[in-house]
From Swiss-Prot:
Keywords: ATP-binding, Cell inner membrane, Cell membrane, Membrane, Nucleotide-binding, Translocase, Transport. Its main location: membrane. This is Aliphatic sulfonates import ATP-binding protein SsuB. Residues 7-221 form the ABC transporter domain. The gene is ssuB. One of its GO terms (molecular function) is ATP binding. PANTHER family: ALIPHATIC SULFONATES IMPORT ATP-BINDING PROTEIN SSUB (PTHR42788:SF17), TAURINE IMPORT ATP-BINDING PROTEIN-RELATED (PTHR42788). SMART domains: AAA. Pfam families: ABC_tran (PF00005). PROSITE patterns: ABC_TRANSPORTER_1, ABC_TRANSPORTER_2, SSUB. It comes from Granulibacter bethesdensis (strain ATCC BAA-1260 / CGDNIH1). One of its GO terms (cellular component) is plasma membrane. Signal peptide: none annotated. It is found in: Cell inner membrane. It is a peripheral membrane protein.
């Protein structure tokens, strides 16, 4: 039996003045599916994410979203005058308590910093707090907007492993916007490549988890995606 998509876009257009950002884009995301969105700068990734977050409305087309959504941005945007646990439950309905926040912080291995002030957190800790803030909302759709781009290499790998583990536990539908092909291949079930506001290619990733960049299938798919993004051509011309 086919599952009803948790996200459904059909012939979505988005224009700002005379500039077309998304042009007839159609995309479904199944419950529990992990989708990575790749594309060059200006391809429409951020515009699509803003539509899925409910921050903008499309100029034209059909868009169906779940009620419970959460976004983790590259910058966690924690309020410096509220301690970590209060940031985690900020805006949550039904009078959430410190216990709710600590439970979410425990999932991201940050419960020991519940009473800390945001400015005392490292970059990785702040991003963990951002993930906890998303988890406490029990989202049907989790949107990740290049959440690891500002982190050092080791912290980025640790955060990727954490996101993979959280997805295995919760099986929330996820859309990850990233420029990192390896990150997309490590985490996602499916990769969508945007170009000029349209879906230029989609690839299902059938490589068993846990995945390793050194595996032949991983390396082959990486080369294919780099080619779709124009990276190999740029390197060859350099």
């Amino acid at each position: 039996m086919t599952q009803t998509p948790v996200v459904s876009l059909h012939q979505v257009h988005q224009q700002f003045g005379s500039t077309t950002i998304l042009s007839g884009l159609s995309l479904d995301i199944a419950p529990g599916e992990f989708v990575a969105l790749l594309g060059r700068s200006g391809s429409g990734k951020t515009t699509l994410l803003r539509l899925l977050a409910g921050l903008d409305t499309p100029s034209q087309g059909h868009l169906r979203l779940p009620e419970r959504r959460a976004v983790v941005f590259q910058e966690p945007r924690l309020l410096p005058w509220k301690n970590v646990w209060r940031n985690v439950v900020l805006g949550v309905k039904d009078r959430p308590t410190r216990d709710h926040a600590v439970e979410a912080l425990r999932e991201v291995e940050l419960a020991h910093r519940a009473d800390a002030w945001p400015l005392t957190l490292s970059g990785g800790e702040a991003q963990r707090a951002g993930l906890a803030r998303a988890l406490v909302r029990s989202p049907e759709l989790l949107l990740l907007d290049e959440p690891f781009a500002a982190l050092d290499a080791l912290t980025r790998l640790r955060m990727q492993s954490l996101v993979a583990r959280l997805w295995e536990v919760h099986r929330t539908a996820v859309l990850l916007v990233t420029h990192d092909v390896d990150e997309a291949l490590l985490l996602a079930d499916r990769v969508v490549v945007l170009e000029h506001g349209r879906i230029a290619a989609e690839r299902t990733i059938s490589i068993p988890r846990p995945r390793r960049p050194g595996d032949a299938a991983f390396a082959s798919l990486r080369l294919e995606l780099l080619g779709l993004l124009g990276v190999r051509e740029a390197l060859a011309a350099a």
